[in-house]
Amino acid sequence: MDSSKVLKLYAELKENAVNNLDIVFYLIDIEKALDELKPRHKFVLTKICIEGYTQSEVAAMLGITKSTINGVYHNALTHFERNFNYDGK
């Protein structure tokens, strides 16, 4: 599963995770993977994938170019993928 889709799914699941233990554990795994990221990477993924900001908006927040944020975003996704190991079980 694409990491950006996982993070968007995280935002949706978090709102709906009332009584489903599997979803709760899935959310915990995602949160752990996010917590293992560098603060800047976590900030960028949270803003773009979970909160819905555009790369341009996040670039403006950080005072960097859109080109730079694109690199940071893809680097953050790569690190997230390494931290988050969902095997579909």
Q: Which residues make up each language-model segment?
A:
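DNA-recognition helix of helix-turn-helix
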Residues: 61-85
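A short pre-motif secondary-structure segment
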Residues: 44-45
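Residue-level signal for the short linker/turn that defines the boundary of a DNA-recognition helix
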Residues: 39, 52-53
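Short, glycine/acidic-rich hinge or "gate" loops at secondary-structure transitions
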Residues: 87-89
